Amino acid sequence: MQSSLLGRMTGVTGSRSKRHTKFRLRRLQQPPTESTTRLASPDDAQPIEETKSQEHLEQSATQGLSEASGDNNAGGAHPTPAPNEGDAPTVAELQHGSNDRVDDGTSGSGTVSGWKLAAVLIGLSLAVFCMSLDSTVLSTAIPKITAEFNSLHDMAWYVSAYNLTISSFSLVYGKIYSLYRVKWVYLTTLFLFEAGSLVCGAAPSSLALIIGRAIAGVGGAGVFLGSMLIVHEIMPLHQVPLFIALISGLYGIASVVGPLLGGVFTDYVSWRWCFYINLPIGGLTAFIIVLFVRPRVREKATVKKTPWAQLLDLDPLGIILILPAVMCMLLVLQWGGAKYAWSNWRIIVLLVMAGSLALTFTAVQLWQGERATIPPRIVRNRSVWGAIAFSVCIYGSFTVFTYYLPIWFQAIKSVSATRSGVMNLPMILGVVVCSMLSGWGVSRVGYYVPFMYMAPVVGSIGAGLLTTLHVFSGPAAWITYQLLLGVGIGSGMALPLVAVQTALPTDDVSTGSAIITFTQSLSGALFNFVAQSVFQSRLVHNLNAALPGVDTARVADVSPREIRNAIEPEYLPQTLEAYSLAITQVFYAGTALCTLALFGVLPIKCLSVKGSRIPPMAHA
């Protein structure tokens, strides 16, 4: 009887011990609180470390399991084998769920390696190159297109329809990519880009060509952003900067190759091949992505929702507001002072609409919170708004010099548009090579902030030297100055995306990347307009000062190549001096922007890409 009673008492004790252990394990599986986890400030959105209380709870749980096992054995139960060290759940696993390990920065569920990784990177690079090529390839083909369609009045829309939709849809895709699997969204946008290219190539009229360009722009915005996000998912974090640098370099190459390739197609085949060339390349990229990329399941997509709830998650009100706001602003920048006077009612209406829609969009984003296209907490992250400021300044400066250095060569050195592009190669090559080197350096060292400081320091020296160009400047001067500028800008151009992808939780990377790409494209359009306004005003002023009593209006209105035909030979030296001075005065704006980029680096946190990735929803 005593033996039986002792056995029942031991069984009760073992049951209580197991129930107590399960209770403690349930406590560990609950979301972390202030007593278990210390979080960084909201602007960092990054977990720091687990406290000693977590270690104590984990040890208690393990001890409880041992006690329960011992009690069961005492009661005559079968012994429970001790778990292997590798099988024991960590605190991070207990907090996030046993099937949701925190990414250690070296691998992920979709990691690709070896020749498969090389194939994916080549496919993505080709797609991005085609997308960026479409921005410049028509510059030499437009005369042939307008002659075929008899559509000189539509000439500006062949370029604008593409650029407008790319800029407008960048933020929209940031939201879509954050909610759905990157692989399938990317393939959809690639299909849109290819469909738009097909429409352009087969266009029977000018209107069809414009529509095709708009469709291609809608897809192109998603292709660029999606390429960055696929790389973020399939590669270790410390290798991502190298590919992002490659993409930035491809943009520089496309700006030079585009006009040359467009001229070759137009002269020897047909202008339609400017678009048909995208079809086989896009098909190859799609085949590679389908075959080798495994999409990561996003945490936000794991919760089953009704179709109405899914629609609300897309922030339809924000999308309805931001698309026309961006389009109105870009039309103002394109038409103001060029096609229409600033006092024209069309420009005034567009300005009012752009401002009103932008203010309403901001209010909606604050009201929507986590459902917003741009959640306010992401913008409050100091690394994000620092990267935004840096991008605006660096891309604005790059735009100024990219557009106006060729004009200086054409006007002052009397070379063709093609030749001026070749003479602009020192800056472009400097950007491409140093962009790659900085990406490699970040991958090796781990820290991107030092390279970002290098951009405004070296770049502003080269930009400042370019303001000293004059009519008699030789190749030694303009080649050296361009190289310095290219080295500076290239060393930091790709790194705002790296900073954002490192500083944000995984599920916020798409939104953060979209914000950066949007500000880059918008700053390019904005400062191109600023440069144009400075150039036109200073050119008229300089010509009037150099040639008093001479009608200088016709000189100010002609293309750079036609200056020598628009003025009498005896006035040509003064005219060239005035023209050169006006362009170098534009370079002052580019120099100021490059210098101001330094202040964008200051708030960016000096994190390492070799550290752990921030787990999804670490900001909660």
From Swiss-Prot:
Region spans: Disordered: 1-107
Keywords from the named record: Membrane, Transmembrane, Transmembrane helix, Transport
Cellular localisation: Membrane
Molecular function as annotated in GO: transmembrane transporter activity
InterPro entries reported for this sequence: MFS (IPR011701), MFS_dom (IPR020846), MFS_trans_sf (IPR036259)
Gene Ontology CC entries for this record: plasma membrane
Membrane topology, record value: Multi-pass membrane protein
Gene3D superfamilies the UniProt entry points to: MFS general substrate transporter like domains (1.20.1250.20), Multidrug resistance protein D (1.20.1720.10)
Comp. bias intervals (Polar residues): 30-39, 59-72
Regions that span the bilayer: 117-137, 157-179, 191-211, 215-235, 242-262, 273-293, 317-337, 347-367, 388-408, 422-442, 445-465, 478-498, 515-535, 581-601
Further remarks about this protein from its record: In A.calidoustus, the austinoid gene cluster lies on a contiguous DNA region, while clusters from E.nidulans and P.brasilianum are split in their respective genomes. Genetic rearrangements provoked variability among the clusters and E.nidulans produces the least number of austionoid derivatives with the end products austinol and dehydroaustinol, while P.brasilianum can produce until acetoxydehydroaustin, and A.calidoustus produces the highest number of identified derivatives.
Homology family: Belongs to the major facilitator superfamily. TCR/Tet family.
Protein name (record): MFS-type transporter ausY
Annotated source species: Emericella nidulans (strain FGSC A4 / ATCC 38163 / CBS 112.46 / NRRL 194 / M139) (Aspergillus nidulans)
